[in-house]
Each structure stands twice: as C-alpha cells, then as structure tokens.
Amino acid sequence: MKLSRIYDTIVLNRTYEHFLTHLRTPFDDVNKAHLVMLSETRILPEETVKKIKEGLIRYDTLRGFPGRKPEEVEDYFFYAEKTLSEFIGETAAGSLHIARSRNDMDTTLFRMAMRENIAAWIRRLIQLLEAMIAHGRRHLVTPIVLFTHGQPAQISSYAHYLGAMVAEMLETVTMQRQAYESVNGCPMGACAITTTGFPIDRSRVASLLGFSKPIANSYQAISTSHWLLVPVQHWILFLNDVTRFVEDMLHKSSFEVGILSYPDDLVQMSSIMPQKRNPVILEHIRIKAGMAMGVFQSFADLFHNTAYQDINENGDLTLDTLQKAVIEMMETIDLFEEAILKARIHAPRVEEIAMRSGITVTELADEIVRRERVAFRDAHHIVSRYVSEGSR
C-alpha cells in the first residue's frame, strides 16, 4: 500500500529518523531480551532461536542505514524485520515477533530512553550540587545582602544564599529518583493489550532490560502517560527554581545594587556604549530554561482529553520533542554552574548597603528584648523610629 507523500514525509519519515538516532540500541536490546525469553520458555525451537540469533548478530554489525525511510516499509520496525528476513528468511524473522506487539515494544523503548534521561540528569545534578557545596564552603563568612520584596532585608553569608538553592535541588532530585522507579516498570508482555496465550516470562524480559519489574496491568502498560508526565513535572519545578535564582542574581548584579559581578569571559559589551558590561549569561540561562519548560508544560496539554488507550500522543514524535528539550535543560545546568562558580561578591558594596539601609537592626531589636527585658513590640517600635530618624 502506497502512503500519502505528505503523511509519509512529515510523520513516518521523521519517526524513522528518530528511531535511527535515539532508539536503535534499545530496539536491539529488546529484540535480544525477547529472543532469550522465547528460547528459555521453549516457545521457539532451538534451531529457530539459533537462526534468529545469527541474524541479530549480523544486524548488530550493519552500517549505512538509509538516512530516510525506504518507501516500501512503514517504519523502523518493519525496516528491521525486512532486513532480518533478508538475512535468515521471513519465517524465522517473523517468529521473533511471537508474543509481542509494537504497542508494548514502543512504550518499552520510550521508557528506556526516558530513564536514561532521568539518570543523566540526576548524575549531572549531583555534580552541580557537589560544586555548589564546595563553593559555599569557601564563602561561609562572605557577607551578602538578602532582599525581600525587592528591598534590602537582612545580611547573611553567601554560603547561606547558595545553600537555599542546594536544598531546593536536593528535594527535586529526591522526587525525580522516585519518578525513576515509576518509569522503570517494563511493559513487555502486554502485547497489544491483553497479553498473550503463549507461556511467556515477563519478569525475565524485564530483568534482562534492566527494569525493576513488569507492569502488572497490561492495559496500563500500553496506555499510561505517567512515564512522561511525572518526570517532566519535576523538571519544570527544577527549571522554575533555577530561573528564579538567576533573576535574583541578575538583580544583585544590577548597577543599582551592585553586590555581584562577573569576570570578562562571562559578559558582553555594547556595540555603541563603551561602558556597558552585560552579564548576559544569566539571560541565556533564562532563555534555555524557558524553552525547555515550554516543551515540558506542553505535554500536559497534549494529553488533555485524549483517550486512555495506546495513542500516538504517547509516541516517538513526542519523545523526539522531549529529547530536544532535555538538551536545552542540560545546557541550562552547564551555564548555571558557570554563573554560580564565577560570580564575585563586592564586600565594600555589601557593607555600604548594610549601613545605609539599616538591615542589621532586627538583631538590635531582639537584643533589646533579651538584655533590657523590653516587650518585643515596644523594642520593634523603638528601633523602627531610630532607623527612620537616622535616614532623614
């Protein structure tokens, strides 16, 4: 059957390209795990298993895949089966598909890709956290002015400031680690919907593919969107925290505040104004984070009011879009780490703001309460009036 050229170009060819780029290795792993299970359960005779094994080994070494989907096949799955048929014959190649479907295969591949994304993000976050903690230890007594509602509020240490973001990230990493466990359930064996009459061993396939367990309900296995929506919600939270912190750093590096600055290798100048030093790395963090967040947030809308079935919203084109957003997110982390580690505190400016704004007087009011036994609210009014008169 010849497919529409428009549909073939816009949908099927892009699906094929995505499989070739991102999912070929997981696809090969699923084939091997499924064959091992078919052999161990004696669903396939030894002679057929041997023939398929030889074909898969040959397919593993295959190079020079067509850059575009061949017209005679619908997708990468059928291209792979057609190629395997050329190696070992149609009967043996077709036997590899006993007790499975593209439904359970595809969502298994997507989960394998997603768990790699999650694992890579967690590893990178741990590196970032270690760098921020080490940096904070070097600034345990470095003073910084902290703001509330855009106004100077209290003085603290730079380590305290960074530590707040470290704590936020640790919470998100913990939640994403839990999400990983949800993603790491194996759909294989669900087949199209209702499993199969063959005596398969779902746990064996799950184990071979590195999953913690099979997904018990086969309809959930091929219908759920949790493998995608749960992790991206945690990434949205993470990126939201990053952009808020970056915006706060941008405020502190403004000319009017001036307690943070960046070295020359992280600023850009104006094409006409010679005095300008723009810390644009902070803006690019916001841009990349915003682009990734936009994609992640779109997935909730994508699944809104869709049928709870095996549907293409739960498919590879969605995953392809996700992969691009993950790249933006990982680059956001690289830029954020660079901005954190290279930011410089201007202690004289911190002291100037502290003196002019009276941000140490909260402790003064508390000390009056402790030492003079004055009522707290009275002490508060005394100090407030003192600051007000001193600022005239």
Q: What feature does the model see in each segment?
A:
Residues 1-195, 200-203, 266-269, 280-284:
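A helix-coil-helix interface module used to build multimeric assemblies
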Residues 1-30, 88, 92, 273-392:
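Glycine-rich cofactor/substrate-binding loops
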Residues 34, 38, 55-59, 83, ...:
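Generic, well-ordered alpha-helical scaffold segments in large soluble proteins
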Residues 43-44, 258, 374:
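Conserved hydrophobic residue
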Residues 102, 215-219, 357, 365:
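A structural signal for small-residue-enriched, beta-sheet-centric alpha/beta enzyme cores
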Residues 107, 111-118, 122-126, 137, ...:
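Charged, flexible cofactor/metal-binding loops and thiol motifs
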